[in-house]
């Protein structure tokens, strides 16, 4: 059974910061806290529209992280150039649409083999490990192995969004079979998208899983578990000012 790691995605710390155009909350500080709590790596998605994580965040995180930086990005010339210059430990190549709220599905590696092969070679030559974010589909897994990616990240969105227990169980079987197939080809298997405190255990139990990348659920839980202390501290400061 593979060692299981947690990559914490801090994109939505940046979402909250950017909503008001302030300097806080700082994703860099959030990354430090996540590492102290046991995160094995920090994941950030530098989108083309910079809707949350910024170039500044990527640069400082690369310089300050104690663990590993996983940079999610689209396969564009701009992003490849940034990755080669920044040299994160990992790059996870993802599909990207400007109008989407979050990544909606996996890469079509099979339909763009040359483009993906070129991107993988360029990143590998820069000393960066690569994963490809794909659906739990054998054709895509085979293509990922063929273009030179040592890792895949299985898109767990359909599992997370399942409306019934039966549908979720079916998706779980599909993911487990995909993980076994990928491992048989020599690929290391990560997974992510939509994983929460309620649905993570079944995915974590899949023996081939190497790392789970989880963000929104953790940030959402942090708001709730930290809200009591945050309100109490503000009230304390106000009363202290009045003597």
Swiss-Prot record:
Catalyzed chemical reaction(s): 3-amino-2-oxopropyl phosphate + 1-deoxy-D-xylulose 5-phosphate = pyridoxine 5'-phosphate + phosphate + 2 H2O + H(+)
GO cellular component: a single term: cytosol
List of residues binding 1-deoxy-D-xylulose 5-phosphate: 11-12, 47, 52, 102
EC numbers: 2.6.99.2
Record-marked site positions (Transition state stabilizer): 153
Molecular function GO terms recorded: pyridoxine 5'-phosphate synthase activity
Subcellular location: Cytoplasm
Cited NCBIfam families: pdxJ, PRK05265.1-1, PRK05265.1-2, PRK05265.1-3, PRK05265.1-4, PRK05265.1-5
Homology family: Belongs to the PNP synthase family.
Subunit text: Homooctamer; tetramer of dimers.
Protein name according to UniProt: Pyridoxine 5'-phosphate synthase
Origin species: Shigella sonnei (strain Ss046)
């Amino acid at each position: 059974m593979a060692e299981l790691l947690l990559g914490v995605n801090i994109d939505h710390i940046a979402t909250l910061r950017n909503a008001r155009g302030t300097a806080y909350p700082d994703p860099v500080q959030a990354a430090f806290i996540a590492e102290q709590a046991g995160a094995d790596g920090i994941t950030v998605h530098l989108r083309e529209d910079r809707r949350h994580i910024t170039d500044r965040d990527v640069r400082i995180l690369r310089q300050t992280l104690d663990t590993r930086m996983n940079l999610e990005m689209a396969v564009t010339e701009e992003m490849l150039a940034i990755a080669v210059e920044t040299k994160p430990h990992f790059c996870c190549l993802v599909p990207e649409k400007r109008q989407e709220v979050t990544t909606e599905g996996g890469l079509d590696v099979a339909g763009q083999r040359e483009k993906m092969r070129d991107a993988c070679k360029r990143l590998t030559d820069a000393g960066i490990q690569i994963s490809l974010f794909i659906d739990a589909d054998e054709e895509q897994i085979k293509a990922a192995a063929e273009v030179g990616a040592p890792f895949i990240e299985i898109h767990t969105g359909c599992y997370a969004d399942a409306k019934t227990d039966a549908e979720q169980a079916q998706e779980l079987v599909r993911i487990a079979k995909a993980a076994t197939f990928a491992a048989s080809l020599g690929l290391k298997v990560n997974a992510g998208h939509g994983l929460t405190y309620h649905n993570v255990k079944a995915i974590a139990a899949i023996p081939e899983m190497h790392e789970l990348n989880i963000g929104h659920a953790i940030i959402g839980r942090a708001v709730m578990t930290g809200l009591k202390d945050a309100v109490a501290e503000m009230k304390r400061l106000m009363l202290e000012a009045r003597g």
